[in-house]
Amino acid sequence: IQRSRGLGDVYKRQHQDAYTIRKFPYKDAKVLLPLKLGKYFRRYKDVNEMDWYDEIKVNEKLKVTFLPAVHWSKRSLTDTNKTLWGNFLIEYDGKKILFACDTGIGDIYKSIGQKYGPIDLTFINIGAYNFYPIMPYKDKSIYHTNPEEALEIAQNLKSKKVVGMHWGTFVLSLEPIMEPPKRFKASANKYGFKKEDVLIYKIGEFDSLKKLLGHN
């Protein structure tokens, strides 16, 4: 998604190693992170760790709220859940974007929808859900939504549009690699969305937040 003027970059969690983080440009940028991850950004000038429901006002038009997700954190055998995980709600110029990082489905999204909805645009994972027999089901994962669960979350958030992400880049699970976007599109109407408001992008494809959010 192209950068909107005044709206900074959101880096989807890519299991970044410390070397990659050190090589990011713009060391004077404001960095917003879940709790206990600031140690990886020591060379940055403005690092802000956030607990669930913390809000940070970046400027007069931009506010970010860190919200719960149904997931976990782990980088080694000894640090399970030692850092926080979650979703970012970005409020910009009167519009709301929910950037759902890795998450499973849960009732928390009904609560988030009641408190913060309606959401204008939701980004949510739709792939990496078949880990059978490591997990008991072939079609769902506790920590990654399948396409239908992603749409149910977007429905609970009262989202106007939803973008499916976290699919088709790396083979992490056993579902066919092109299954998530097909199911995502096919299930749109069932969850109250027009097909044109359920969006899928190819690797390297660009779009404009201004267009997606309906800014004139």
Predicted regions and their residues:
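Cap/insert and terminal regions of metallo-dependent hydrolase folds
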Residues: Y19-T20, K30-L32, K36-K39, G106-Y201
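Short active-site oxyanion
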Residues: F24-K30, K95-I97
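Short, flexible loop segments at the rims of nucleotide/cofactor-binding pockets, characterized by
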Residues: D9-K12, R75-D79, F99-D102, K138-Y143
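Acidic/His-rich segments in extracytoplasmic proteins that coordinate ligands and/or metal ions
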Residues: K12-F24
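Single conserved hydrophobic/aromatic residue that forms the stacking wall/gate
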Residues: I1-Y11
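Metallo-beta-lactamase
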Residues: R5, I90-C101, D120-I126, A186
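Core dinuclear metal-dependent hydrolase active-site scaffold
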Residues: M50-G117, I203-N216
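Helix-loop-beta element that forms the nucleotide-linked donor phosphate-binding surface
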Residues: Y40-D51
